[in-house]
């Protein structure tokens, strides 16, 4: 459910992180070959999640589209008629997946107070010395982030056009929450179906182009040299 389900201390291989693997295996080996220092991967993932709702970054505001109000960070439900002054809450809130993946429970939005504690990235780092005693004296550095997500956002006509700004906010939030203001940040684009982005539906293009935009120093000079976008469309393969 988007939290740390297995913790391994050893060479990256099948079985070291439980009975499931993902793109961290290919990525991790490349990082290990490139760097002389030991590399620790902390993976938090969950499918079918949007930045517009599930990963809505802390501080993200409420907004209105048509006659609907959309939740700000920590609010529930995801949307309601603006004329409704007392919308009925649901068992989820804007940004809950962000909280569960990245923040200590004490830093969760107030709406998260009734949810069970989880083991997440914040816990791994807080217990680094215990989990990785061989490296306790050396400590750790947040050397970078990788973000690969976006498919769910493109299925929503409100979230898709807001994706780029939400991604900017997410990059800034993660750097702030992990005290790594200049850590490199790699964004992998959505790539379902492969082919050319110009042949995709309009909302797909909005998300994809937003992902590519944040890595363009002409559009985001504040990210120049620290944010890189990678187009994954050419790597799609049909099994």
What is the meaning of each model-derived region?
Residues 1-239:
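Cell-envelope and extracellular/periplasmic
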